[in-house]
Every structure is written in C-alpha cells, then in structure tokens.
C-alpha cells in the first residue's frame, strides 16, 4: 500500500508539473479536496484541446474549466472506483477505472464501453485517432 501511495504522489507531481509549467515562471496553484476536487488521491490529470483540465481521482472526476469546477461521480453514471486515466478523441471524453472498465461521456452522463474485455484497466492511451486500452482479461 505504501508503494502505491508513493507512486500516486509521484505521478501527481509529474502531471502537475507538466500542466502548470515551470516552477520558476508564473503562478502555482494547489488544488485540494477543500477547493472542490473530488478527492486528494489523484491518479491522472489530463488537459484537453479546449484547455479544460480533467482530474481522475479516487472518488470520481473533477473538471476545471476556467473559473468553474465540476464534479462527476455516481450520479453521472461513474462506478465507485478509482478513475485511473482520462483521455479524449474528437471531444469525446473516455475514462478508465480500476476494476470497473472504461466509460465515455455522452450528454453529461458516463456510459460503460461494452466492447472492452476485462474490467481491470492497466492503462489507456490516445495515439492519433485511436485509443489503446490495456486490461487483465477475465475468464
């Protein structure tokens, strides 16, 4: 469990650095649960082409859109599972969960992607105009 926590902290730091830039330039802002983030346990941070920031957490997704913060959780169709990866293709947002498969955002609700075999997603990457998903197949 300690190694998982260290890994989560490492990736969170790397992604924050990537998105928010050089520490010697500009203004840094730390977002916490008290600021409206779904959870302080962050698994993924993704910036889309509209400059919105999607944060995959232990308790759903938080969308940072300018000055607005929006949370997506069970009431939006997401399972109660860790959101480990967020990506998009042509404006369609996909999320990978730990143990509950992959979901796509349609009309402000997440729907499960049924063609993905295996619910335990290891990673998901957007390469060109395709999404590649690594899962553990189940019998």
PLM regions with names:
Residues 1-139:
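Carboxylate-rich, polar loop motifs that coordinate divalent cations or form catalytic acidic clusters
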């Amino acid at each position: 469990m300690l190694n998982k926590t260290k890994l989560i902290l490492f990736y969170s730091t790397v992604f924050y650095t990537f998105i928010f830039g050089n520490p010697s330039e500009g203004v840094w802002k730390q977002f916490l649960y008290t600021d409206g983030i779904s959870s302080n346990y962050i698994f993924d941070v993704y910036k889309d082409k509209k400059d919105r920031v999607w944060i995959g957490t232990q308790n759903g997704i938080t969308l940072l859109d300018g000055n607005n913060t929006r949370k997506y959780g069970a009431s939006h169709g997401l399972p109660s599972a860790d959101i480990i990866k967020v990506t998009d293709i042509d404006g369609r947002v996909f999320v990978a969960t730990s143990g509950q498969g992959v979901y796509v955002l349609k009309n402000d609700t997440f729907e499960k992607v049924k063609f993905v075999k295996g619910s335990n997603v290891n990673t998901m990457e957007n390469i060109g105009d395709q999404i590649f998903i690594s899962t553990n197949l189940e019998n």
